C-alpha cells in the first residue's frame, strides 16, 4: 500500500459546516476520492475517507475480503464522523455508492443526505452470473480500473480483479437493491453518459427504488466511470458542496 492509498481525514473543528463520509469503489482506494475530499475541505466541510478492507493492496489480499467487512468499515467511519458533532453526509463512487445506500437503509437517521457517483446496484453483463463457479477455476480476471475519458489520468487499483471479491460484491447488491425503499434521505446523483464499468441504468434503478422526497440528478457528458478524476469532476465537487449547503440550511431552518 502506498501513502496515496491511505485513508484520510480533514477535521476543520468548530468551523466545519458538516462532515462528508467518502467511500471509494471496488478494487480502488481513497486516492480516487482525495480531489473530491480536498475540494469539500476547502468549501468548509470535514471529510473522512476510509480504506475498505482488502483494498490498496494486491488482488490476492482483496480476494479474501467480503462485503460485510467493507460495510463494517464504512459504518465505523460513520461513527467517527458523528463524533465530530456536525451533520453527516455520505458520498460514494460505484460500489462506494452501493455501500452508502446500504448505510442509509440501516442507519438513515444518522445521515443528512447521500451523494452518489455512478452507483452500482446490478451488473448487466451475462458473464457475471458465472462468477460463483468461475472463482474456483479462474481466481482473477483483468483489472476494471481507470475507465477515464481523460487521457493523462490513471486510477490506482489492484492489478487484477479477484473473482471471489466480485462474488461478494454481487451479494451486496442482492441485499441492498430489495431494500432501496428504506432510503428516505435526500439524494444527489451524478451519472456519466458513457460508462464502461457500471451501466448508467443503475442510477435509474436507484432513483426508482428509493423513497427520498428530494432526488437531484445530473448527467456527466464528458466523463467515464471514474468521474471523480475525469473531465466533469468539478461538477461533482461544486454540486455536492451546494447540495450539502442546502440541506444543512433546511435543517437549521426547521430547528430555528
Regions inferred by a protein language model and the residue ranges of each:
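Gly/Ala-rich beta-loop-alpha elbow adjacent to hydrolase catalytic centers
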Residues: 92-96, 100
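Conserved alpha/beta-hydrolase
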Residues: 41-59
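Catalytic histidine neighborhood in serine/cysteine hydrolases
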Residues: 204, 208-226
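Catalytic active-site module of serine/aspartate enzymes centered on a nucleophile-bearing elbow/loop
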Residues: 221-256
Amino acid at each position: 500500500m502506498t501513502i496515496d492509498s491511505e485513508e484520510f481525514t480533514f477535521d476543520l473543528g468548530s468551523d466545519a459546516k458538516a462532515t462528508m463520509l467518502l467511500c471509494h469503489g471496488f478494487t480502488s482506494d481513497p486516492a480516487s476520492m482525495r480531489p473530491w475530499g480536498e475540494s469539500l475541505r476547502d468549501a468548509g466541510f470535514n471529510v473522512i475517507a476510509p480504506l475498505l478492507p482488502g483494498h490498496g493492496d494486491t488482488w490476492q489480499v482483496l480476494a479474501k475480503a467480503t462485503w460485510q467487512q467493507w460495510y463494517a468499515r464504512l459504518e465505523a467511519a460513520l461513527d467517527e464522523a458523528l463524533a465530530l458533532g456536525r451533520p453527516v453526509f455520505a458520498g460514494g463512487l460505484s460500489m462506494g455508492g452501493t455501500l452508502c445506500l446500504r448505510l442509509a437503509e440501516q442507519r438513515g437517521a444518522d445521515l443528512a443526505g447521500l451523494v452518489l457517483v455512478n452507483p452500482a446496484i446490478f451488473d448487466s453483463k451475462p458473464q457475471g452470473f458465472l462468477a460463483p463457479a468461475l472463482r474456483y477455476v479462474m481466481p482473477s480476471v483483468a483489472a476494471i480500473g481507470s475507465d477515464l475519458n481523460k487521457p493523462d489520468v490513471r486510477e490506482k487499483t489492484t492489478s487484477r480483479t479477484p473473482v471471489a471479491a466480485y462474488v461478494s460484491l454481487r451479494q451486496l447488491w442482492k441485499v441492498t437493491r430489495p431494500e432501496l425503499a428504506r432510503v428516505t434521505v435526500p439524494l444527489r446523483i451524478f451519472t456519466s453518459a458513457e460508462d464502461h464499468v457500471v451501466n448508467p441504468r443503475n442510477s435509474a434503478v436507484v432513483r426508482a427504488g428509493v423513497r427520498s422526497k428530494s432526488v437531484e440528478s445530473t448527467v456527466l457528458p464528458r466523463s467515464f466511470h471514474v468521474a471523480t478524476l475525469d473531465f466533469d469532476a468539478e461538477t461533482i465537487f461544486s454540486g455536492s458542496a451546494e447540495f450539502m449547503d442546502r440541506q444543512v440550511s433546511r435543517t437549521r431552518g426547521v430547528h430555528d
